[in-house]
Each structure stands twice: as C-alpha cells, then as structure tokens.
Amino acid sequence: MSYRTRFGKDNSACDSGNAVEGSGSSKGPNEVSNDFDHEIAQLTKHRSRPHQLLSQDMPGKSRLLVSTMKMLVGRESNHSGRGRFSSADGCHVLSRYLPINGPWGVDQSTSPAYVSQFSNDGLFFVAGFQGGHIRIYNVDKGWKVQKDILTKSLRWTITDTSLSPDQRYLVYASMTPIVNIVNVGSSMTESLANVTEIHEGLDFSVGGDEDEFGIFSVRFSTDGRELVAASRDASIYVYDLQANKVNLRIPAHSSDVNTVCFADETGHLIYSGSDDNLCKVWDRRCFNHKGQPAGVLMGHLEGVTFIDSRGDGRYFISNGKDQTTQLWDIRKMSSRAMYSPRLRDHDWDYRWMEYPAHAKTLKHPNDQSLATYRGHGVLRTLIRCYLSPAYSTGQKYIYTGSSDHCVYIYDLVTGAQVARLNHHEGPVRDCSWHPLYPMLVSSSWDGTIARWEFPGDDQVPTLERPRARRKERLL
C-alpha cells in the first residue's frame, strides 16, 4: 500500500486535540509559559491555522482545532474560495497525525548507528554506522538499499554525513581532517572505497598544519557548492568544492565545535555550537579574519551538541549536555560572551557519568534563549534535535534523540511533551522525520534503524527489541 493511501486515513483520536503518546506524554518541567507570545509562537500558529471560514463555528468565534472531516467538507464545498487547501490548512490536518506507531525495522547492524537522515524530498534515507558502513535506502521502493558504501580513512566512527541538494554526492566525516565525497548517483550498488568506486578525500587542514583533528559535523550549502564543517580544533571550516580547497577557517570557539549549519538558503549566516557552552552566529558578508562572530547566545550550562536552523536566518534550536533543548532568536544575541559561572563543584564527563541531579533545574544567569525543553537525556554521545517538517507540521514540534533510548517530541509553543517513542536498547543519537509524510526513523547504538508511522494501518510492527549489549561504547 502506498504512503499516500495509508496516510490519507482519518483517525478520530487525532481530532480530539489530546496529547498522543508512543509510550507516554506529559507537560514536563519545560520553561515555556502558557502565554508564550513571542513572534515565533505566532508564526508557528499561523503556519497551521486553517482558513477562518473553516474554523468558525459561529460568527466571531474561532475553534482552535477543526476536525479533519469538517476540513474536507469545507474544501469540497469551496468555503475558502480557493477550491483546495492552503499550506496552513494542510498543516492543520497533517500536524495532528504523529508518527508514533511501530516500530518497523529498516535495518539491523552489529555496529552502533550514528547518523540517519532523509533526503530533502524524502525519496532516500541515509544511515551511517560506526563500523564504517553507510547505506542509502530508496524509500519509495520498499526501503531497498540503493547504495551500500564501505568507507575509508575512518577513525573511531562516522561522525556525520551530508547528501548534496541534487542527491548525486554524499560526504562523510570521521575523527580526521579528511572528508570523503562519493558519487552516489552511479548505477553501482556496492561502493567500496577506491576499489569499486573512487572516494575522493577533501583535506580540511590548512597552512601546512600537521596537527590532526576530527570533524564532528559537515553540511552542504543549499547550492551544493560549499561544505561547512565543525572540528575538534575549535574551528569552523568552509570548503569550496569548485576550487577544491578550504576558503575560510574561523577560530570560532575556545573548545571543540560539535555542530555547525547554514542559517538559510543564502549561505551568508552560519550557526555554531561548542563545548564552551556557547552558540555563535557568523556573518560572512562582514567577516574579519580575527574570528569575531556577529553575535553570541548564552543559556546552555554545558556543551552544545547539535544545532538545527528553522531555515529563516532568524530562529534555531540547540541540544546541550545540560540535558535541555533551547530555542533561540538571533536578534537577542550579544556582541560578546559574558562571564559563565561554574555551577558544579566537581569534574563531570557526559560520556560516562550521570548528570548531577541538583543541576537539572539550574538556569544560566544571562540566559538569552526564548524557551527551554526538558525530559530527554543528552549523555554518552552528541545527541541531535530537530524542528519538525514545515510542509506537514508547520515546524510546530521539536523532536530529539535521547540517551535513555527514546525519541521525544515536544510542542514548540506550549512546551508539552506530546510523545515519547520507546523501543531501543541503546542511546538514540539521531532521528529524522519524513519531509512529507507522518513517518519518523530513529537510529540507535543498539545497531537498529527503526521506522515509526502514524497509527491507522493494519500492519503489525515487525521489529522486536534487540538484545542488550554487554558493553556500551562512548564518543
């Protein structure tokens, strides 16, 4: 059965407006007030607000949630005068269908899964494993393996992958300054590095620098001409693919840079997050080589593990080792970092220690974030978080992996935990929501790639819990 048919089904439970759950949901101790009236809240609501003629029960009174049946009747009756759903109408319907049913198995490996992402159009899915395998699955063809890549120059693990906008090339990074690029548009399924296909190495070291450093994060620009990378040497690198060289190195932070991304389609703004607890904004149009950012955002009490941009050059979210996800508006940034107090009285290592209980409720005295979301765990590895897709949800949710083996979904505006997906036997380092359909895929250190979908199909989930590992590995 096609996804279009499956996800066209109605479900009265989703029309009730109640929170749904994979294995539990709750309000949680999140710092988002009921009257959260920042512009981002209004923008998010507007993206999923139905046409006023469809949402009115009586003159002058608007319902917060309109049933799917009423929306469809209104569309067929052409109440809006457009003869179709607007993007906001579509989001109003689709955003209530959460991918909480399952899971079904996509793949199982003896090696921990580190990265997993859908392509921009949702046709392909990329998964990377610590043992050196990267697999690209064709989603529309029953998750058939389109490309099976055995990597080279691997040190410890695959830290990140990125698929080019035209979906012809894939880059993968490791704990070395070499990023490899592979032609994934070729007809050959098996891609053994420099045996069946060439994996070209892109050297991010500059100026004869002999120091070895690892790369934690790498991303293609929207036009596919550049790569931006975050490294262990506290720097950000921009690589020009046409010139085949690094054209910019920014000494960005005072500690490891764990995450970096372009803020929008222009490529002018770059966001970065580091173990120095700071998020920084870089504007390449007015950049000077002294490494001065356009601004600094404070709020995390521990290192930043991941950043995801809303894509508008203004808002983004970040995961932190202080066990929080935070929402940011770059218009609140400072020109420099103020004093960051030490709020724990002993050394703490997130890779093998639990987060101190007393620190879970602490707040940065100079917190510039708009909202804070708690409930998930950011331990053992660089856990990733994302905004839900614009097309189907209007980016009204935040979802994140977790060191407690689950995936958490929060309402961006209310802060409520609306779902917790519980299956894995190891930390969920990465997860990805399909850009068009209510489908989410999680990847875990238990080696499992699991698929979650909207309830409504008669299929029974096929994935059994994996056996617990004797030893948990660390990054």
UniProtKB/Swiss-Prot annotation:
Q: Which UniProt keywords apply?
A: Repeat, WD repeat
Instruction: Give GO terms for biological process.
Output: proteasome-mediated ubiquitin-dependent protein catabolic process
Where is region (Disordered) located? 1-34
UniProt cross-references to Pfam families, sorted A to Z: WD40
Instruction: Identify the GO cellular component terms for this protein.
Output: Cul4-RING E3 ubiquitin ligase complex
Classification via InterPro entries: DCAF, DCAF11/LEC14B, WD40/YVTN_repeat-like_dom_sf, WD40_repeat_dom_sf, WD40_rpt
Annotated PROSITE patterns: WD_REPEATS_2, WD_REPEATS_REGION
SUPFAM superfamilies assigned: WD40 repeat-like
Q: Where are the WD repeats?
A: 211-240, 252-283, 299-329, 375-411, 423-453
Positions with biased composition (Polar residues): 23-33
Q: Which family does it belong to?
A: Belongs to the WD repeat LEC14B family.
The entry's protein name is LEC14B homolog
Q: Which organism is it from?
A: Prunus armeniaca
